[in-house]
Amino acid sequence: MAITDKLNAIGDAIRNKTGKTDKLTLDQMATEIGGITTDGDGLARSIVNKTITNYSDSEVTVVGGYAFFDQKKLTSVSVPSATSIGSYAFSGCSALTSVNVPKATTVSDRAFQQCTSLTRLDLPKVTTLNGYLVYGCSSLVELNAPEVTSGRGYAIAGSKIEHLSLPKLKTPGSSVFRDATSLRTVYMPKLDRLEAYLFYNATALETVTFPNVASANNQSMRGCTALAYVDLPINKSISTQVFYGCSSLNTLILRKSDDICTLANTNAFTSTPIANGEGYIYVPEALLESYKTATNWSTYANQFRAIEDYPEITGG
């Protein structure tokens, strides 16, 4: 039986179970492979045969929520015309190794959650990394999403992604890279602020340079225990507990030359080498004395150094 016939038959079975009378045609099934509500509590179940191992359909434009949910035998999917992928669409597909969704612009929350065999995911048209997108994808080492401009919480938590390039990411939500414990380096040149909890507990992150970040919000880098070097060229403010528990942080560079960066609370550096007198904050020489006496910064007066005096560290 062809896959479309199977889908149609399953649609008929679900319709019989729910008491609905509207006919689901093959064309409709091909257009929207989606989750069907089976009871009043909003739970949905996959409508795809549990024995399927490969799926390819160039006609599909929408992959609905839960469409392939928990398909343990599914190894490859190709839906080259799909522009939208619903929540949990491939969640739990533990054998999935190949995904082809070149036109998808929207991929909803948890779409690839717990796809534990997936090593690479290409989302060339997606603009938002939605919540828990690849949560628990314990083999995933590469994510290609060059058009992403925003994100939501825990998008890559539980993956093995070490290097992440998001050249257009500008305004992420809070906690987007929280618990991304394998992440070592990031390239995000357009990022304009560090939202609350943005890199919270990204324990492998080593160095960061954010040329366009103007503010570092509450606990945005907290618990980044491998983080040793932070360069914030135009940053204007550092909120509470931003670097709390960054136990390797020995270099912070604040290059903004027209005014000092405000510090909301001294706890921004609690449990760091800077707080322990072993790390340093590099600022423009013209602002050095102002930083030493500024509110909250005065606590770390002995840790300030002039950028110009340490070109080997700061690049001058």
Which positions does each model-derived feature cover?
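Short, aromatic/basic amphipathic alpha-helical patches
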Residues: 265-271, 289-302
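Structural signature of tandem-repeat unit edges
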Residues: 47-62, 71-84, 94-106, 116-128, ...
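Short, surface-exposed acidic
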Residues: 20-28, 297-306
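Surface-exposed receptor/substrate recognition regions of extracellular proteins
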Residues: 1-62, 277
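Short, low-complexity, Pro/Ser/Thr/Gly-rich segments in the mature regions of secreted, periplasmic
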Residues: 309-315
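Short acidic DE-rich linear segments
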Residues: 1, 315-316
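Consensus positions within tandem repeat domains that build extended binding/scaffold surfaces
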Residues: 64-67, 86-91, 108-113, 130-135, ...
